[in-house]
């Protein structure tokens, strides 16, 4: 028996309730989250300004030592430059820019020769310097040091540009953290224990759960090639036996209908890879909050994927938790 995928008569009502829940969260918490991020970004911009001599001494060596400032530099131009636009304008390798803007580990390309790296970074510097927004960084044309007010003002402007470019990921990340917290509180109330330091998916004890755990799967049914796929939540029920697979849950939130229907194949692909590896008895469900319409739900249901609505988290009990 399914949880929600076999109850289409309730889908519209649940979608409406889920939208209301998402919108209430967005109105109450999104502005605060955005402001906090802007404050953090402003501090990062001020740091980048100091490192570059307030953009008057930007050089390949500085970029090499501080690759993390590249997104800030892109937002310091007139007009601000998208990542791929910078690659085209500067005529540099896309992989270099991607490595420098890696959020987890910003770095220059390790296998690139010193000469090539210096040439590539020089092209980036020339492009940025040529397009610096002199209306924001008013001291550059005047060839002087900025005062504290000018630094703070310019940092706020660039931080706003950064946050504007990142607004969807900022909100999505905040919502994901909130969803994981809701699940954690629910499982804790039932006596479950979280693996806070990581665990292999096939070594979980009964009555435990973990977040953002990799599960190794076959890429396709007729292939021996394997890949790690991250799963938001793994739960091993109290009554689980040795060798049982944990319950797998993917958290999903959406602030509009368009994006969910663009991305719905991702879950179906993940489900198919899990079935290719572990058989038909895999439990892989979604935890939904927001704009998920009948088109999305019908697609997932046809792929054998069930879901739990966040506004009715008690449905999780039907998983045997």
What do these predicted regions represent?
Residues 162-222:
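Acidic-basic catalytic patches of nuclease active cores, encompassing PD-(D/E)XK
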Residues 102-123, 155-160, 191-206, 229-237, ...:
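Short, charge-rich amphipathic segments
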Residues 1-157, 161-170, 177:
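Nuclease-adjacent, charged terminal/linker segments that flank catalytic cores
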Residues 4, 23, 28, 99, ...:
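Detector for Asparagine
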């Amino acid at each position: 028996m399914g949880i929600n995928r076999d109850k289409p008569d309730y889908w519209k009502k649940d979608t409406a309730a889920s939208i209301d829940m998402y919108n209430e969260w967005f109105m109450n918490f999104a502005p605060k989250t955005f402001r906090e991020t802007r404050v953090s970004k402003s501090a990062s911009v001020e740091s980048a300004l100091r490192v570059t001599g307030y953009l008057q001494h930007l050089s390949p060596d500085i970029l090499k030592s501080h690759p993390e400032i590249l997104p800030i530099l892109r937002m310091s131009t007139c007009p601000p430059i998208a990542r791929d636009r910078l690659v085209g304008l500067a005529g540099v390798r896309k992989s270099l820019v991607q490595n420098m803007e890696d959020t987890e580990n910003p770095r220059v390309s390790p296998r690139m020769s010193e000469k090539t790296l210096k040439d590539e970074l020089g092209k980036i510097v020339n492009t940025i310097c040529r397009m610096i927004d002199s209306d924001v960084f008013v001291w550059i044309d005047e060839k002087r040091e900025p005062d504290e007010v000018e630094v703070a003002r310019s940092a706020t402007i660039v931080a706003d540009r950064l946050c504007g470019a990142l607004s969807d990921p900022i909100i999505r990340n905040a919502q994901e953290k909130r969803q994981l917290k809701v699940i954690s509180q629910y499982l804790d109330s039932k006596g479950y224990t979280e693996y806070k330091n990581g665990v292999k998916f096939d070594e979980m004890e009964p009555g435990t759960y973990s977040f953002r755990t990799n599960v190794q799967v076959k890429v396709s049914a007729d292939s021996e090639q394997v890949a790690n796929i991250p799963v938001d939540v793994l739960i091993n029920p109290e009554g689980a036996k040795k060798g049982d697979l944990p319950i797998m849950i993917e958290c999903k939130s959406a602030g509009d209908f368009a994006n969910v229907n663009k991305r719905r194949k991702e879950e179906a692909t993940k489900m198919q890879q899990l079935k290719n590896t572990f058989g038909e008895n895999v439990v892989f469900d979604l935890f939904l909050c927001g704009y998920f319409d009948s088109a999305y739900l019908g697609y997932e249901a046809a792929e054998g994927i069930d879901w739990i609505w966040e506004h009715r988290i008690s449905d999780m009990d039907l998983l045997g938790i």
